[in-house]
Amino acid sequence: MFLRVIDFFQLHLRWYSVGLIFFSFIPIYYSIIVCQPQQFKIDGFELINPVFNKHHSTRSCTSATKSLQNGLIALFIFYALKIYKKVYLIVLYIILIIHFGFEIRNAKSETSRKYIAISTREMFMYYVELLLLYFQNLLLLPYICGGYFLIRHVHRIPSKEEVDRQTLKFKEEARRIKRLMIEEDWHVKEANEDVKNKIEQEGLKRKDMEFEEQLYHLRIEKVKRREQVLKQKLEEKKAKRRQNAERRKKRREIAMEQREQ
């Protein structure tokens, strides 16, 4: 399970880590805040450590220790940002929050510490030391805020097998959609053909009905003509029969007259 961080948070936190490392390891900065050695010379210019050490048997400065811690934390976070597992990022983030809480507690204890028999200059440098200490604690806040958004805006990068599986799934889905579209087109085409056939059948039915109606009228006319022809023939036959009957009647009359004579 690989995780990839959004480039915005990752890039800015890495640049911030580089800046914090550079700030924590400036030699002149350490010559001022580090209690050992007591004096530091650069090109004949002597820098005397302003922080009083007569009340500390360890001869150590809190701000110097804190600066070293910040530098190491920045270096560790710079390389830890290459981790893409969300569980590891959450664990490191919790450790950072716990460390920040302990540093705040140490800063409060350093503030509540009381010194006696110190000069005004030493008191002034004491407050400068506290100011540096709080400032160095505040330098961890971007990691806390950025780490929160870093963990929140983590999205997953699938493995090669999952990509292949997802690609295969997409291809199968594309084939299925294409097949459904072809079937839908076929159904639409079939429905259009059915509608067209129905329209053609209705047109043919109408034509058949018109043709049958025309045939019916033609048959009626033909029957009427036959009836007329039959009537004419009957009338002609009747007329011939009448003529024949009249002829026979005349012949009989002529024959009877001849017999009487």
UniProtKB/Swiss-Prot annotation:
Residues 234-261 are annotated as: Disordered. One of its GO terms (cellular component) is membrane. The chain crosses the membrane at residues 15-35, 87-107, 131-151. Keywords: Membrane, Transmembrane, Transmembrane helix. It is a multi-pass membrane protein. It is found in: Membrane. The keyword Oxidoreductase does not apply. Residues 234-246 have a biased composition (Basic and acidic residues). This is Uncharacterized protein F07F6.2. It comes from Caenorhabditis elegans. The lineage of its organism: Eukaryota, Metazoa, Ecdysozoa, Nematoda, Chromadorea.
